[in-house]
């Protein structure tokens, strides 16, 4: 969902947003991106089998449904195919696409794999997830859209961050949201992480403090976005922009209220309740991409 949303956010016009070059650039980027996601999540499961037997026993490797050997073949094949597709086409293999793929592969590898295994260190683990969810995915695929679909053949990730406010702000928003999800993910996993000596913030500080801190941070983020776009809607003379900004504002405020309401019935010490809430945040994460093209 992120890739189409960022292509439409970068579009200079409604006609360009639904043109053949745009749709082609989207599809070409989505295939290696899905393969890279398979590599990163698969590698994490391969290296966390013993922990997952405690925290997430239903995952395929932990449950014995997929052998470690077959899993390794799958993730390595996904990595090679993903990176190969990134450079296979002279036009669609943009700098933005390759930054997204290589950056995700690098951070995903050192996050899970020894001797680095950055997930053992709270600050470094959070940095990896924020970097991928924020700058790498958003700015890189925005740059890919500009280069592959909208004629800015020399578009770079840093250039788009510096030149396009929508690119910078979307990267900032999803970077903060990514931080919330990264830290909230560890709250229901405290028992297994403590046994494996993975000192997440939830293990160090306590699941209750992390849960409430992340709930507050995310609700403030949504309310700030809602207020900002409401002000933008009131100050523009364009009917179209006012409508887009109003819809973005209402969506953000409703999402912020949802973050607070759903948290009221959650016991931070109950791993199942926290996991359900964590999955609710993922729904809001992807719904935010659904609204993103309106954020102008």
Q: What residue ranges belong to the model's regions?
A:
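Multi-pass alpha-helical membrane architecture of UbiA-family
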Residues: 1-296
């Amino acid at each position: 969902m992120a890739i189409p949303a960022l292509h439409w956010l970068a579009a200079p016009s409604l006609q360009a947003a639904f043109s053949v070059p745009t749709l082609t650039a989207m599809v070409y980027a989505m295939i290696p991106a899905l393969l890279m996601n398979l590599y990163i999540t698969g590698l994490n499961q391969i290296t966390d089998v013993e922990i997952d037997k405690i925290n997430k026993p239903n995952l395929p490797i932990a449950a014995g449904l997929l052998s470690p050997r077959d899993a390794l073949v799958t993730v390595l094949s996904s990595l090679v195919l993903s990176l190969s597709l990134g450079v296979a086409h002279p036009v669609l293999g943009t700098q933005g696409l390759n930054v997204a793929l290589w950056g995700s592969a690098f951070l995903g590898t050192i996050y899970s794999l020894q001797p680095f295994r950055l997930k053992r260190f709270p600050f470094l683990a959070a940095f990896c997830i924020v970097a991928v969810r924020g700058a790498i995915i958003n700015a890189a695929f925005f740059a890919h859209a500009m280069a592959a679909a909208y004629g800015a053949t020399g578009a770079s990730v840093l250039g788009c961050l510096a030149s396009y406010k929508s690119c910078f702000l979307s990267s900032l928003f999803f970077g903060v949201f990514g931080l919330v999800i990264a830290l909230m993910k560890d709250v229901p996993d405290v028992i297994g992480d403590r046994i494996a000596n993975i000192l997440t913030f939830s293990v160090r500080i306590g699941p209750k403090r992390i849960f409430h801190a992340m709930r507050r941070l995310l609700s403030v983020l949504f309310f700030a976005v809602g207020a900002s776009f409401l002000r933008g809607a009131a100050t523009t003379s364009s009917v179209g922009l006012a409508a887009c900004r109003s819809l973005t504002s209402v969506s953000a405020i409703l999402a912020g209220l949802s973050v607070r309401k759903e948290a009221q019935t959650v016991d931070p010490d109950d791993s199942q309740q926290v996991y359900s809430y964590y999955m609710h945040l993922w729904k809001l994460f992807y719904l935010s991409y659904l609204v993103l093209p309106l954020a102008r």
